[in-house]
From Swiss-Prot:
Name this polypeptide is given: Undecaprenyl-phosphate 4-deoxy-4-formamido-L-arabinose transferase
GO molecular function: phosphotransferase activity, for other substituted phosphate groups; undecaprenyl-phosphate 4-deoxy-4-formamido-L-arabinose transferase activity
Main location: membrane
Transmembrane stretches, start-end: 235-255, 269-289
Disulphide bridges: none
Enzyme class: transferase
Organism the protein comes from: Pseudomonas paraeruginosa (strain DSM 24068 / PA7)
Location in or out of the cell: Cell inner membrane
Entry function: Catalyzes the transfer of 4-deoxy-4-formamido-L-arabinose from UDP to undecaprenyl phosphate. The modified arabinose is attached to lipid A and is required for resistance to polymyxin and cationic antimicrobial peptides.
InterPro entries from the UniProt entry: ArnC_tfrase (IPR022857), Glyco_trans_2-like (IPR001173), Glycosyltransferase_2 (IPR050256), Nucleotide-diphossugar_trans (IPR029044)
Family under the similarity heading: Belongs to the glycosyltransferase 2 family.
Alphabetic keyword roster: Antibiotic resistance, Cell inner membrane, Cell membrane, Glycosyltransferase, Lipid A biosynthesis, Lipid biosynthesis, Lipid metabolism, Lipopolysaccharide biosynthesis, Membrane, Transferase, Transmembrane, Transmembrane helix
C-alpha cells in the first residue's frame, strides 16, 4: 500500500431542514479544514429543505474568499442521492462525507485525511459511545447485522456517514446508474484497501433525526434488496425445504390412511388446509419479493436521473484560493445545472 497524495480535500454535506445548525456547522467545518494545511472545499447540498437552509447555503457560498459550494436540488431525493449530487460537484483528491446535524464532530476530519494519506481507498468510522436513544440504537444494530450477513461487506457502523473516499472510488460510484444506492456499501465494493476508525459522537443539539425506527427498518429492506440477491437464494432454500417437507408429510398421511382407514383421513382435513395455507403464504411472500426486485430493475432500465440540480452557487474566480482555481473552479455566480 503506497501513500496517497492529497492536494485538495472536498467535504460533502447533505442538508435537509438544518437551518438551526448550519452556522455552527460551517464555522466548525471551515476551522477543521483550515487545520489540514491543504486546499479544501465544502460542498453543501440542500435536499429540498422546507426551512431557510437553501438561503443560508447560498449566502455562505457567495462570501468573498470562501471555499463553500452550494448545490440546491429542486426537491427532496434522499440522503444518498444528495451526497451523489455533491460528489458530482466536488473536485477533491479526497472526498469526505459528513452529516449536517453535528452529531459527528467536523473536528474528526483531519484524522480521516491522515489515514487516507497512508494509502487507504476508503476510511470508515465507528461511532464511539453513541448518544442516540435506545429506539435509534437497536434498529440501527439490526440494520448493521442484517446488511453484514446479506452483503458480506465487513463494516461495523453503516449508519455513520463520516467517511473518506479517494477520487477514483468516487468516480466509480458516479459511474453506477442504479436508482437505489447505499454509498458505504457501494464504495467498499470498489475499494481494495479499507479501514475504520473510532470517532466521537454527540447528542443532536437542533431538531430531530430524519431516520425514525420504522424508516431504519425500511432502509434495511432497501439495502438487502438493492445490494444483494441473498434473499432470493434464501427463498429458494426455503421453497426447496418446504417442498421436501410437503412430500414427506404426504407420504405420512398416505401411510396413516392405509393403516387406519379413510375415516382418519377425513379427520385430517383441517391439517391439510393448514398446510395449504402455509404453502400459499410462502408463495405470496416469494411473489412479493420477486416483484420488489422486478420493480427495481424496471426503475433502473428507465434510467431516469437520480436527482435534478436546480442551481450551483460558488465563489467568484478572483476570490478562490489558487489551489482551487487550478482544480478547475471557473464559474462566478449562481448557475443552473442538470444531473
Amino acid at each position: 500500500m503506497k501513500p496517497y497524495p492529497i492536494d485538495l480535500v472536498s467535504v460533502v454535506i447533505p442538508v435537509y431542514n438544518e437551518e438551526a445548525s448550519l452556522p455552527e456547522l460551517l464555522r466548525r467545518t471551515e476551522a477543521a479544514c483550515r487545520s489540514l494545511g491543504r486546499a479544501f472545499e465544502i460542498v453543501l447540498v440542500d435536499d429540498g429543505s422546507r426551512d431557510r437552509s437553501a438561503e443560508l447555503l447560498q449566502a455562505a457560498a457567495e462570501r468573498d474568499g470562501c471555499a463553500v459550494v452550494a448545490v440546491i436540488l429542486n426537491r427532496n431525493y434522499g440522503q444518498h442521492a444528495a451526497i451523489l449530487a455533491g460528489f458530482e460537484q466536488s473536485r477533491g483528491d479526497l472526498v469526505i462525507t459528513l452529516d449536517a446535524d453535528l452529531q459527528n464532530p467536523p473536528e474528526e476530519i483531519p484524522r480521516l485525511v491522515e489515514r487516507a494519506a497512508q494509502g487507504y481507498d476508503v476510511v470508515g468510522s465507528i461511532r464511539d459511545n453513541r448518544r442516540d436513544s435506545a429506539w435509534r440504537r437497536w434498529p440501527s444494530r439490526l440494520v448493521n447485522l442484517a446488511v453484514q450477513r446479506s452483503t458480506g461487506v465487513a463494516m461495523h457502523d453503516y449508519g455513520c456517514m463520516l467517511r473518506a473516499y479517494r477520487r477514483s472510488i468516487v468516480e466509480a460510484m458516479l459511474a453506477c446508474r442504479e436508482r437505489s444506492t447505499f454509498i458505504p456499501i457501494l464504495a467498499n465494493g470498489f475499494a481494495r484497501h479499507t479501514c475504520e476508525i473510532r470517532v466521537a459522537h454527540a447528542e443532536r443539539a437542533h431538531g430531530e433525526s430524519k431516520y425514525s425506527a420504522m424508516r431504519l427498518l425500511n432502509l434495511m429492506f432497501d439495502l438487502v434488496t438493492c445490494m444483494t440477491t441473498t434473499p432470493l437464494r434464501l427463498l429458494s432454500l426455503v421453497g426447496g425445504g418446504m417442498a421436501l417437507a410437503g412430500f414427506l408429510f404426504a407420504l405420512f398421511l398416505l401411510v396413516l390412511r392405509l393403516a387406519f382407514g379413510a375415516a382418519w383421513a377425513g379427520n385430517g382435513l383441517f391439517v391439510l388446509f393448514a398446510v395449504l395455507f402455509m404453502f400459499s403464504g410462502v408463495q405470496l411472500l416469494g411473489m412479493g419479493l420477486l416483484g420488489e426486485y422486478l420493480g427495481r430493475m424496471y426503475s433502473d432500465v428507465r434510467a431516469r436521473p437520480r436527482f435534478f440540480i436546480e442551481r450551483v452557487v460558488r465563489a467568484a474566480p478572483s476570490a478562490l484560493p489558487s489551489a482551487l482555481q487550478r482544480a478547475g473552479f471557473t464559474s462566478s455566480s449562481s448557475e443552473p445545472s442538470t444531473p
